Design a protein with these regions (language model features):
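Short amphipathic alpha-helical surface micro-motifs
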Residues: 20-26, 42-43, 58-63, 113-117
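Charged linear interaction tracts used for macromolecular binding and regulation
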Residues: 82-151
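Short, hydrophobic/π-rich interface segment
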Residues: 157-160
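N-terminal ordered "arm"
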Residues: 2-48
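Aromatic- and glycine-enriched beta-alpha-beta binding-site module
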Residues: 35-106
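Short, surface-exposed, charge-dense and proline/glycine-enriched linear segments
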Residues: 60-63, 137-142, 163
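Conserved small/polar residues in nucleotide/adenosyl-binding loops
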Residues: 162-169
Length: 169
């Protein structure tokens, strides 16, 4: 039986495709707008656990690179965990992000062809109303400025920017 886990907090993702990413409207079947997809999926956990281990305060970035449509698989995936995380927290985040303990990444794990490993770096998250930026030391940076909604210019038209539970309920 796998370890029970739950995480909640701020989630951000962005890729190098033109707006709007074709994966979103084609269930990952379209060609990336620049031939390959380079994406960063960021989670800043405010509350969470892996069994009895607290994951509150842990930040991590899942880096994904694909050639061609994401649905075709053979993704290269790497994980960057904040350098303030304990060794046990890094192991737990690795298990969650690999899909080995269920949750959203379990379905995506079949698409991964190459796991590039886990690195540790200082992760800084800057989140404003209509933008975010994340740096993971010298390893990665992810950011976006949202397009204002016509109905409410202070809200984004569309953005994968959530405060939500990442684990299955």
């Amino acid at each position: 039986m796998s370890t029970e886990w739950k995480i909640s907090g701020d989630y951000f993702e962005n890729c190098n495709c033109d707006y709007v990413c074709p994966c979103i409207i084609t269930n990952m079947a379209a060609e990336p707008t620049h031939g390959s997809c380079k994406a960063g999926l960021v989670m800043s956990i405010t509350d969470g656990s892996f069994g009895e281990l607290s994951l509150g305060g842990v930040k991590f970035v899942v880096m994904v690179m694909t050639e061609g449509p994401m649905i075709d698989g053979n993704w290269t995936v790497g994980l960057i965990v904040d350098d303030t995380a304990s060794d046990q927290q890094v192991e737990a985040i690795g298990a969650i992000c690999s899909g080995d303990v269920g949750g959203p990444m379990e379905n995506a794990s079949a698409l991964v062809g190459n796991f590039a490993g886990i690195e540790r770096a200082k992760i800084d998250v800057d989140h404003a109303a209509m933008s975010f930026s994340v740096t993971a030391g010298e390893l990665a940076s992810v950011g976006a400025e949202m397009i204002p909604s016509m109905g409410d210019p202070e809200q984004p038209l569309y953005c994968l920017l959530y405060t939500s539970d990442a684990a299955d309920e």
